[in-house]
UniProtKB/Swiss-Prot annotation:
This is Serine/threonine-protein phosphatase 2A 55 kDa regulatory subunit B delta isoform. The lineage of its organism: Eukaryota, Metazoa, Chordata, Craniata, Vertebrata. Keywords: Cell cycle, Cell division, Cytoplasm, Mitosis, Phosphoprotein, Repeat, WD repeat. Widely expressed with high levels in brain, heart, placenta, skeletal muscle, testis, thymus and spleen. The modification Phosphotyrosine is found at residue 305. The gene is Ppp2r2d. InterPro entries: PP2A_PR55, PP2A_PR55_CS, WD40/YVTN_repeat-like_dom_sf, WD40_repeat_dom_sf, WD40_rpt. WD repeats lie at residues 32-71, 97-138, 181-219, 230-270, 289-327, 344-385, 420-452.
Length: 453
């Protein structure tokens, strides 16, 4: 189905409207490349929301306490911490520039008052600690209040330093740097359910790391052929199972997914399960292999299903059924007739991500023209919504959009020929427990929530 039906995307069977909550970022027409958002991620509680951009910065938003005095106040997200995660580098051995762009952010489950996250660019992964400080020590023996050393001859009494209140300060400090393990560009990182290890994947290899050890990683997948001329596919995404710490999956540019069990062997070159949908020979074309390349793979929270995103669709797979997906949701089927021009302008290589809602009953992914799509798995209804400042009045309901692929266009429909392919939503995130979503549109972060009447 091209376009959307229905008035909103339900997350359990009851329809509700999505409405505008907030938008972050400048309104400028000319957007600096460094300001373009490249990843979005809620933490496990949903109280923190992190974004990374092409300039190597990480911005963390914190949800404010709900204001009981204001009707329908749901708690807004405001800037909590901003820090430079990665800087541009140069590999002198290979004469290559290494971009500072943040490819992925992954939160670690919170163990104490501090928060920890992993961020990665093409080559280097960093573990960051985000902590608060609202007290400072005063009354040192050897230093004065400004930090200057005191004259030892003037120190006549022993002082015990005391803690005094100060304005709240949020500090982001790098605790570990994991480098020099990837020859190719890192496309995925995933924290294991044991909370001690994580994996990182590039085009040809997947490495397993311990969070405490930076100088050693274990290569668990290596698909690099002895002769690079024989290379037929690359790894596009990888993720650990949410509950079984020995199981992970990785997807390929050929549209296949391999599930591996680390208990079987140290090097998981032989998969435990192989997921692939048979190709329909009648629909084979020059673009078939390009559009079948998987750009994202995500396990459901339950661990029973996984979702993959290719160029035109989202597929849901049952881990017990390798032969075909149990669900196929068409994201923008109306673009199938435009593949030639999308190939010429390189849009056909765009990597769209996808995400589940907290109960695994709905899924979300992005499209062009700042549209994003939602699919309800229970009712089989879907909706197309738009992230736009034109709808940015507080509590304004999002109006479902429809795309017309030809013939007579109705009043509220948009022609496929008038879609703006420079405006694309590649990165989205869904709050783990509530109906709150975050959508990255170029340099702006939109936050939407369900409308409570």
């Amino acid at each position: 189905m091209a376009g959307a039906g229905g008035g909103g995307c339900p997350t359990g069977g009851n329809d509700f409207q999505w409405c505008f909550s907030q938008v972050k970022g400048a309104v400028d027409e000319d957007v600096a490349e460094a300001d373009i958002i490249s990843t979005v991620e809620f933490n496990y509680s949903g109280d923190l929301l992190a974004t990374g951009d092409k300039g190597g910065r990480v911005v963390i938003f914190q949800r404010e306490q709900e204001n009981k005095g204001r009707a329908h106040s749901r708690g807004e997200y405001n800037v909590y911490s901003t820090f430079q995660s990665h800087e541009p580098e140069f590999d002198y051995l290979k004469s290559l520039e290494i971009e500072e762009k943040i490819n992925k952010i992954r939160w670690l489950p919170q163990q104490n008052a501090a928060h920890f996250l992993l961020s990665t660019n093409d080559k280097t992964i960093k573990l960051w600690k985000i902590s608060e400080r609202d007290k400072r020590a005063e009354g040192y023996n050897l230093k004065d209040e400004d930090g200057r050393l005191r004259d030892p001859f003037r120190i006549t009494a022993l002082r015990v330093p005391i803690l005094k209140p100060m304005d709240l300060m949020v500090e982001a400090s790098p605790r570990r740097i994991f480098a020099n393990a990837h020859t190719y560009h890192i496309n995925s990182i995933s924290v294991n359910s044991d909370h001690e290890t994580y994996l990182s994947a590039d085009d040809l290899r997947i490495n397993l790391w311990h969070l405490e050890i930076t100088d050693r990683s274990f290569n668990i997948v290596d698909i690099k052929p002895a002769n690079m001329e024989e290379l037929t596919e690359v790894i596009t995404a990888a993720e650990f199972h949410p509950h079984q710490c020995n199981v992970f999956v990785y997807s390929s540019s050929k549209g296949t997914i391999r599930l591996c069990d680390m208990r079987s062997s140290a090097l998981c070159d032989r998969h435990a399960k192989f997921f692939e949908e048979p190709e329909d020979p009648s629909s084979r074309s020059f673009f078939s292999e390009i559009i079948s390349s998987i750009s994202d793979v995500k396990f459901s929270h339950s661990g029973r299903y996984m979702m993959t995103r290719d160029y035109l669709s989202v597929k849901v797979w049952d881990l017990n059924m390798e032969g075909r997906p149990v669900e196929t949701h068409h994201v923008h089927e109306y673009l199938r007739s435009k593949l030639c021009s999308l190939y010429e302008n390189d849009c056909i290589f765009d990597k769209f991500e996808c995400c589940w809602n907290g109960s695994d009953s709905a899924i979300m992914t992005g499209s062009y023209n700042n549209f994003f799509r939602m699919f309800d798995r229970n009712t089989r209804r879907d909706v197309t919504l738009e992230a736009s400042r034109e709808n940015s009045k507080p509590r304004a309901s999002l109006k479902p959009r429809k795309v017309c692929s030809g013939g007579k266009r109705k009043k509220d429909e948009i022609s496929v020929d008038s879609l703006d392919f420079n405006k694309k939503i590649l990165h989205t995130a869904w709050h783990p427990m509530e109906s709150i979503i975050a959508v990255a549109a170029t340099n702006n972060l939109y936050i939407f929530q369900d409308k409570i009447n």
